[in-house]
A protein has these predicted regions:
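Domain-level signature for soluble enzymes in the chorismate/prephenate branch of the shikimate pathway
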Residues: 1-231
Length: 231
């Protein structure tokens, strides 16, 4: 009482910051003591013999003989083929760097429980494309330096800034982020798709992902993979 409004704001911000740092420590200790990491993953590389692709994107295929690739008409079909065992992986363009991302492929990963396991950057006519391979199992290898996640965040002041601050507290850099609004419970909310420069199979990143799972409305891992460069 009697404090200047600007001092109240600064004091409140300081208290919030202390609480955030305290929660970070508590989540890390909880994970150590209870072994309660909420996601399972394999440490064995995926064996891919029957990849599937959208026919119009077959030209980007570099790692497989094109006559061995199953071609379909949509990403949804690729997802169905993987789930039915007709294909063991999908390949597609998830982003044209500096131009835009594929909403269809992001939706497929989020809704069909599919995971990026490889990422290559191709250049063609001055356009850089992120070409990803995805399977129905989350695989984490020591060489991986990227983690892609999707989380839901309510549309109120400070919600995303607190999440980004949390990620920063772990010393993690973001290499890509985009959002998409959706209608839920009579209000607009947001799905955020985030790529982080990190490896899941480390103590700090497991603690970060555990904290994200507790402090967002919903969290899903979309992949673990290696990607060269700053994109």
């Amino acid at each position: 009482e009697g404090m200047k409004p600007e001092l109240v704001r600064e004091y409140t911000a300081l208290i919030k910051r202390i609480m955030e740092v305290s929660r970070k420590y508590q989540y890390g200790r909880t994970l150590e003591l209870r072994q309660c990491f909420p996601f399972e993953y394999s440490k064995m590389p995926a064996v891919i013999l029957k990849p599937a692709m959208v026919k119009e994107e077959l030209y980007i295929c570099e790692d497989f003989s094109k006559d061995k690739v199953i071609t379909v008409s949509s990403y949804e079909e690729i997802g169905n083929y993987i789930k039915e065992g007709k294909a063991d992986a999908g390949i597609g363009i998830i982003e044209e760097v500096g131009i835009g991302v594929s909403d269809e492929l992001h939706n497929l990963l989020a809704e069909k429980d599919l995971y990026i396991t490889q990422c290559k950057v191709q250049e063609d006519g001055g356009v850089r494309r992120k070409v990803v391979t995805f399977t129905d199992k989350l695989v984490v290898l020591p060489s991986h330096n990227r983690v892609k996640v999707m989380f839901e965040c309510p549309n109120h002041s400070g919600s995303i800034s607190s999440i980004l601050s949390m990620i920063s507290d772990y010393g993690v850099n973001l290499t890509e982020i985009h959002s998409r609004p959706f209608w839920k419970d009579n209000s607009w909310n947001y799905k955020f798709f985030v790529e982080m420069n990190a490896n899941i199979d480390t103590k700090e990143i497991r603690a970060l992902i555990y904290q994200l799972s507790q402090e967002t409305a919903y969290l899903k891992i979309l992949g673990s993979y290696a990607c060269e460069g700053d994109f």
